Regions:
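C-terminal substrate-binding subdomain of Rossmann-fold SDR/epimerase-dehydratase oxidoreductases
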Residues: 94-219
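N-terminal Rossmann-like NAD(P)+-binding domain of SDR-like oxidoreductases, especially those catalyzing
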Residues: 1-71, 198, 202-203, 207, ...
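Structural element of the ATP-grasp superfamily
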Residues: 1, 52, 89, 181-182
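NAD(P)-dependent short-chain dehydrogenase/reductase
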Residues: 26, 50-109, 114-123, 150-155
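Short, conserved glycine- and acidic-residue-centered signature motifs
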Residues: 44, 82, 174
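Short, hinge-like loop/turn segments at secondary-structure boundaries
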Residues: 31-32, 81-84, 179-180
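Conserved donor sugar-nucleotide recognition element shared by glycan-biosynthetic enzymes
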Residues: 40, 48, 82, 145, ...
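Short beta-loop-alpha junction of Rossmann-like oxidoreductase domains
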Residues: 23-25, 74-76, 172, 180
């Protein structure tokens, strides 16, 4: 992809992950911090970032390198092994099944609504916004898992929660310092988390079956 972009002058928008911070527990995260991937997935994202930045510096390929923080929202598959936590929890709640929380629920995430991610990516494409290195894509809203569960119980009053041992490789806390994001995309305002969560619940209730169990084939 990068080689084609070098040859054609195409603008590359690459999706990386906040998981590249890994062992760095300092909060909030900013783009100048040291990186310490804790999983092969995170390491692969960091390696890809290196290629993107190398093509930008060596060949002047226009690039926008976005580090996503816990993206959620409609059309996200809720039922596979690596499903994101929010659609997975909502899907289980819809089936009347308990949700699993690894740890005591005091872990935090800087959730980012997919609508906001789309706005950022489309603006970068249309206005040719590039980054000098990576840019964290989250607005600094540190949401604790227990608070998220309390919000979900407004939609699923009988929701049951199983608290389990922490998993090896899980990041306990996540929060972005959004200064660079706001300076590059000043016109974009994220939807409040609870409103975005409610929209996600409504979408999964109406359309969840269409994305569960993988892609469908037509006869």
């Amino acid at each position: 992809m990068l080689e084609v972009a070098r040859q054609t002058g195409a603008h590359v928008i690459f999706s990386s992950s906040s998981s590249v911070y890994g062992r760095n527990t300092q909060l909030p995260k900013d783009e100048s911090m040291w990186l310490g991937p804790m999983t092969p997935y995170a390491a692969s994202k960091l390696a890809a970032e290196g290629y993107v930045q190398a093509y930008a510096s060596a060949y002047n390929v226009p690039t926008t390198l976005l580090r996503f923080f816990n993206v959620f929202g409609p059309r996200q598959r809720p039922d596979h092994e690596y499903a994101a936590v929010l659609p997975k929890w909502i899907w289980l709640a819809m089936q009347g099944q308990p949700i699993d929380v690894y740890g005591d629920g005091t872990a935090s995430r800087d959730f980012t609504y997919v609508e906001t991610v789309l706005d950022i990516a489309m603006t970068a494409m249309k206005e040719k916004v590039t980054t000098d290195g990576a840019m964290n894509l989250a607005y600094g809203n540190r949401i604790f898992l227990n608070d998220t569960i309390a919000m979900l119980k407004k939609h699923f009053p009988d929701l049951k929660v199983n608290y389990k041992e922490n998993r090896l490789g899980d990041v306990k806390e996540s929060q972005n310092a959004p200064g660079l994001l706001k300076s590059l995309f000043p016109a974009i305002t994220p939807k409040p988390f609870e409103a975005a969560l409610a929209e996600t619940v409504d979408w999964l209730k109406e359309f969840g079956q269409s994305v569960a169990n993988g892609p469908k084939t037509l006869d």
